[in-house]
Amino acid sequence: MRALSIDVGSSSVRSAVVDEAGAVTFPHRAPLTVRSPHPGEVELDPGEIAELAIAVAESTLRESGGVDVVGVTNQRATTIVFDVRTGRAIGPALSWQDLRTVLDCLTLRARGLRLAPNQSATKVRWLVEHVTEERSHLRFATLDTWLAWHLSRGELFVTDRTNACVTGLVTRDARRWNVDVLDALELDPSMFAPLVDSAGPLGPARALSGSPTLCALVGDQAASLFGQACVERGTKVTFGTGAILNSILGSTPPETDYLLESGCYVTAVRSQGAVTTWALEGIVLSAGACVQWFGELGLGDVSGSSALAESVPTRDGVVFVPAFSGLGTPHWDFGARGAFFGLTRGSSPAHLQRALLDGVAHRGVDLLDAVGREGGTVGDVVRVDGGMSVNRFFVQRFADLCGRDVAVSAEVEATTRGAGLMALVGVGHLTLADVAKLSGVAYVATPRWSLDERAQRRDQWRQHVERTRGTIPELSSVSF
């Protein structure tokens, strides 16, 4: 049995076939149009998202000869409001990166309601407030809801709990919409889709050739975790534009909806029947974006960043702190800014590249340290995926700094693999135990440094991070 995986990321839509052994074949990709009409605003075209998802899926289906089931994974918290009568969006899709509702969040916090601008809650209200006519026909959609609606040709209006739990609009156990929050935001409960499990038959995807059954809806980070065979335990870090860690906790719901002292959140990563699986989540705001920026300056080629870093034996005293848009976990200082330290006339692009990759690796270890402070268990092996996972120098440096084996996913985009495997579990063809055996590891990087050397480097790193904090005091004083 084979699954079609549809993966809507922040800048592209991907599709592929995933088989019961976890092999990913017949991949197709199309770029999304991302607009930023004003500083801090990030929009996508809802119609384009649906059209491209179906188009790339059809390309995969034509090449592969068809599939049995479909799994969908997507960037979380990106928000759409649409007219249920026509299936058309009433405005742009507001990306999870969109910050236009920052002031709304601060105003609501003063009234006792804590919401963050990267959640869906205030984005929904912003979109609804810009509708002047009758609103009873409006419906809210995260991207899983939007794709399920279009793949089923309007028959399915649902959302899964891994997507719902990052909207800011559900109860702590992610079992139902929080009517108190909806009331506070003056949002009609009829706008919101029924909450469903991540894995399980939902209905035919009639917009696709053969009408395969839609059997999984899952947020991107949960799909990445699942795609790397982290089922009942395990920790992964996805190093993409930013970096996101997830470390499985178990089935006990969180005690709070808010940011923990460690700078992590607790989020749902899978739900089946009465059981929801939870994980700690930590975020680095700038990771691969730093490598891309360095290349755009003409100082090094993105694809050759590993070779450039390895062309010199040391950083020659140069240190880089990646904080283009602030520091996430554990600091959450939006006013921090990125910086190079220790520059001299002898500093070359190779020294800077090496320092840059070192800095991103350090930030990854900051995430692991946060899990430890929260009482979580990282384990002896950390799994990694995402664009930076193909950089062997970076992966080795991450292993050296964290003192653990680092298992690199054979699939750079483990989200695609995870959504397909989730669909095969949803239809009953695979069990969770089966998936746990499908590690899909390309290679393992083993740490080379002593405990004393790691400790010394980590102490020096923390000192440099502190020097970047509070660069823009007004932003550093903001918290959500």
Q: What do these predicted ranges mean?
A:
Residues 62-95, 116-118, 148-171, 196, ...:
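Short beta-strand-loop/turn "lid" adjacent to the catalytic site in phosphate-handling enzymes
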Residues 66, 188-191, 361, 378:
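Short loop/turn motifs at secondary-structure junctions
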